[in-house]
């Protein structure tokens, strides 16, 4: 294998983070190892719908047209989140572990954390580019999760997912986010950390900085 880091590969140079199937398989391996015997079906569907959303094949949506917050960034971030979750589960006592259901929710939230940049065909017809939503895109992502999770059979996760997605932005003061279970707050911090790690570990991070708001 070449010693040079490839532009669209993760920090280990082993997973092509521009390829949804490659990232899905890597996340599946981590999830199955961390939570043996747990179904990956809903996560498989979430990856499928994520790819459709960002490529313009999800009903009612135009696809991703922002230069920086694209499919590759989200896949890179979701892989980082899955690795953080796996490491966290190994490092804490059993009562403090997130568990499979909460980990699943965190991964799905990661997949759609930038869905607020995607324009809807009718609701957003007055906008010409997803970058116009930058200042409030996380709230739009939360709205997308509120609509999407029940379709996936995960209505129970709506309340938490629509809050912890805000750990990827600045629209809410994180110190003021209150959730009943501290493990949900941990998920939020892991998601926010994964978002930052994925950005800074990107092989082309410096080159992409000028594109971050377009």
List the predicted regions and their residue ranges.
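Active-site alpha-helical segments that house and flank conserved acidic catalytic motifs
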Residues: 102-116, 188-199
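Histidine/acidic-rich helix-loop-helix segments that form or flank divalent-metal centers
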Residues: 149-210
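Non-catalytic interface/linker regions that flank or bridge core catalytic/transmembrane domains
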Residues: 1-64
